[in-house]
């Protein structure tokens, strides 16, 4: 079992430069404490996430830590050009000596997608094409691709990752019917939610994995479970701290939905 941190970098009420510095100091603490990895969210136009460009913040994390693995959870591929993602991934992996964990996803907020002119209902094909191009660019020295959204002919890729063929891939998983793709492609998954549906997902993952891979259980990709946790001297103190932090985070979480008259 490994322990990591997932951070939205949501607005905290302090000056933004101090907000970033506070988080970087926390990353240094996670590094010294022996945490496995530090993951950050990507959000746009909302106080839920101040690391709108994950690569910029993670470049600082790479320089402030020595052993801690880190990465986006996730890069929103439907909002970014795949060649830029390829190049930033390679740079981060090189700058950290091969410590990048690569989270990828389509994006979950229709309002944030709309800021970029992307229709959330039609974003799946865009995401799939972008993912295919990113994986090609991380594995090969030249990109040739013909799709609906992207067309590339003999595009050279001069950068490369330390980790071969790619850094570890992470994918957020909320439904068991999405498991086969992740298990077949040996992608690490992370889940939220109650224990029962999460168990359904992880059981299904192990089942599909065993059908397609024969390397043994020690090669099974990681399956993460997200939980809000506060450690304090007493339950009462922990609850008090947790409520203060959770109330602020949840207000930020609802921000765009409330602004569009769709409160959660």
What is each residue range found by the language model?
Residues 1-70, 164-167:
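N-terminal beta1-alpha1-beta2 module of alpha/beta enzyme domains
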Residues 175-195:
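A conserved active-site cap/scaffold subdomain adjacent to cofactor or substrate pockets
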Residues 31-32, 58-67, 89-100, 183-184, ...:
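Acidic (Asp/Glu)-rich catalytic clusters
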Residues 123-157, 196-264:
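An alpha-helical appendage that flanks or caps ligand/catalytic pockets
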Residues 3, 30, 34, 42, ...:
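Conserved, mostly hydrophobic/aromatic
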Residues 3-7, 38-40, 69-73, 100-104, ...:
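Hydrophobic faces of well-ordered beta-strands that scaffold small-molecule active sites
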Residues 2-16, 78-145, 149, 189-197:
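Flexible, glycine-rich active-site loops centered on histidine and acidic residues
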Residues 7-21, 75-83, 121, 163-173, ...:
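Active-site mouth loops of central-metabolism enzymes
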């Amino acid at each position: 079992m490994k322990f990591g941190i997932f951070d939205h970098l949501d607005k905290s009420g302090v000056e933004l430069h101090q907000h970033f510095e506070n988080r970087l100091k926390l990353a240094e603490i996670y590094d010294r404490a022996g945490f496995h990895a530090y993951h950050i969210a990507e959000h746009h136009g909302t106080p839920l996430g101040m690391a709108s460009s994950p690569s910029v913040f993670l470049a600082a994390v790479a320089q402030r830590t020595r052993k801690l693995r880190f990465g986006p959870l996730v890069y929103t591929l439907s909002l970014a050009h795949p060649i830029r993602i390829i190049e930033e991934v390679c740079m981060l992996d090189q700058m950290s000596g091969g410590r990048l964990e690569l989270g990828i996803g389509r994006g979950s907020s229709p309002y944030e997608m709309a800021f970029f002119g992307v229709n959330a209902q039609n974003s799946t094909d865009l995401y799939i094409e972008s993912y295919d191009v990113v994986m090609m660019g991380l594995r090969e020295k030249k990109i040739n691709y013909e799709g609906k959204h992207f067309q590339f002919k003999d595009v050279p890729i001069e950068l490369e990752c330390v980790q071969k063929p790619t850094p570890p891939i992470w994918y957020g998983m909320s439904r068991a019917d999405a498991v086969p793709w992740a298990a077949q492609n040996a992608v690490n998954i992370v889940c939220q939610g109650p224990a029962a549906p999460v168990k359904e997902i992880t059981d299904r993952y192990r089942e599909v994995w065993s059908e397609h891979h024969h390397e043994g259980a020690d090669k099974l990709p990681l399956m993460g479970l997200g939980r809000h946790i506060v450690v304090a001297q007493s339950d009462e103190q922990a609850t008090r701290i947790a409520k203060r932090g959770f109330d602020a985070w949840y207000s930020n979480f609802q921000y765009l939905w409330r602004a569009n008259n769709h409160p959660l």
